[in-house]
């Protein structure tokens, strides 16, 4: 983990309220595990006070750049959406434990399941898995056609299936419907998205190796404030800190 300034190289809207930002700086050189995140100070003032956790979508160490994708949903991300090329951002990262891309053997098949703003970290994951000789299948869920992003980008690494709640793009319904209707075969699931989606995957595939990236509100980002705790299967009183112990967990470790 490092703390430093990163320079905004580009910032553009790629879907409804969805922005893609490229950041350049030394922190990119120590990014590696897919699924980690950056903790970004969005303003030089005290408002908003807390940093914003944004997952890393793509890592380019040679260019010292990382790409983040975020949804404009609140004052913090609104301010972030206004950043221009050349602006400097105070960044802490990379933080958290990512997906174990190295755990899958060459020739195995990974099913990558993303929901909404949980889609971005799966892009770097898919890239790394493909480079290791692992086959990737992508199932991406969105509310509507206007919310869909990175469908074409993911197709570079394997098959892509899109589901929308209203049926305006791809299949109508949930990501779990696509998996069953298409009869997808896989060795492992790696997913990021809203809790109901993660819970459904955990319940439907108890015999599969399933890794889940949790979406929780965070305060400090380093495990000190206890704002992002998640209960575990071990007992009602045991918990993990999503920012420090996660955000990626084995499905059987966490209580959803």
From Swiss-Prot:
UniProt-listed Gene3D superfamilies: Dihydroorotate dehydrogenase, electron transfer subunit, Nucleotide-binding domain of ferredoxin-NADP reductase (FNR) module, Translation factors
A GO term for molecular function: flavin adenine dinucleotide binding
Spans through the membrane: none
BP-aspect Gene Ontology terms: 'de novo' UMP biosynthetic process
Pathway: Pyrimidine metabolism; UMP biosynthesis via de novo pathway; orotate from (S)-dihydroorotate (NAD(+) route): step 1/1
Sequence ranges assigned to domain FAD-binding FR-type in this UniProt record: 1-101
Cofactor(s) the record lists: [2Fe-2S] cluster; FAD
Positions with a binding annotation for [2Fe-2S] cluster: 220, 225, 228, 243
Listed CDD domains: DHOD_e_trans (cd06218)
Entry-linked InterPro entries: Cyt_c3_hydrogenase_gsu (IPR012165), Dihydroorotate_DH_ele_sf (IPR037117), Dihydroorotate_DH_Fe-S-bd (IPR019480), Dihydroorotate_DHASE_ETsu (IPR023455), FAD-bd_FR_type (IPR017927), FNR_nucleotide-bd (IPR039261), OxRdtase_FAD/NAD-bd (IPR001433), PyrK_electron_transfer (IPR050353)
Entry keyword set: 2Fe-2S, Electron transport, FAD, Flavoprotein, Iron, Iron-sulfur, Metal-binding, Pyrimidine biosynthesis, Transport
Organism superkingdom: Bacteria
Cofactor details (free text): Binds 1 [2Fe-2S] cluster per subunit.
Residue positions binding FAD: 52-55, 69-71, 76-77
A Pfam family the protein falls into: NAD_binding_1
Oligomeric form and interacting partners: Heterotetramer of 2 PyrK and 2 PyrD type B subunits.
Family, as annotated: Belongs to the PyrK family.
PANTHER family: DIHYDROOROTATE DEHYDROGENASE B (NAD(+)), ELECTRON TRANSFER SUBUNIT (PTHR43513), DIHYDROOROTATE DEHYDROGENASE B (NAD(+)), ELECTRON TRANSFER SUBUNIT-RELATED (PTHR43513:SF3)
The protein's role, per its UniProt record: Responsible for channeling the electrons from the oxidation of dihydroorotate from the FMN redox center in the PyrD type B subunit to the ultimate electron acceptor NAD(+).
Protein name: Dihydroorotate dehydrogenase B (NAD(+)), electron transfer subunit
């Amino acid at each position: 983990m490092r703390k430093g300034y990163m320079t905004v190289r580009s910032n553009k809207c790629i879907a409804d309220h969805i922005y893609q930002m490229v950041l350049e700086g030394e922190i990119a050189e120590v990014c590696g595990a897919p699924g980690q995140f950056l903790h970004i100070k969005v303003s030089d003032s005290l408002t908003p006070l807390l940093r914003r956790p944004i997952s890393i979508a793509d890592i380019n160490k040679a260019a010292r750049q990382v790409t983040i994708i975020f949804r404009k949903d609140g004052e913090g991300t609104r301010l972030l959406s206004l950043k221009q090329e050349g602006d400097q951002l105070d960044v802490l990262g990379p933080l958290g434990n990512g997906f174990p891309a190295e755990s899958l053997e060459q020739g195995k098949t990974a099913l990558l399941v993303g929901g909404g703003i949980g889609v971005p970290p799966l892009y770097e994951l898919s890239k790394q898995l493909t480079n290791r000789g692992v086959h990737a299948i992508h199932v991406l869920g969105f509310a509507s056609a206007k919310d869909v992003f990175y469908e074409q980008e993911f197709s570079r690494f394997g098959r892509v299936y899109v589901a929308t709640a209203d049926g305006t793009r791809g299949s109508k319904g949930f990501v779990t419907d696509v998996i069953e209707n298409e009869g997808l075969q896989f060795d492992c699931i790696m997913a990021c998205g809203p809790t109901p989606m993660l819970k459904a995957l955990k319940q439907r595939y108890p015999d599969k190796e399933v890794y889940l990236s949790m979406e929780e509100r965070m305060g400090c980002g380093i495990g000190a404030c206890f704002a992002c705790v998640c209960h575990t299967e071990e007992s009602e009183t045991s918990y993990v800190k999503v920012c420090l112990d996660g955000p990626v967990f084995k499905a059987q470790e966490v209580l959803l």
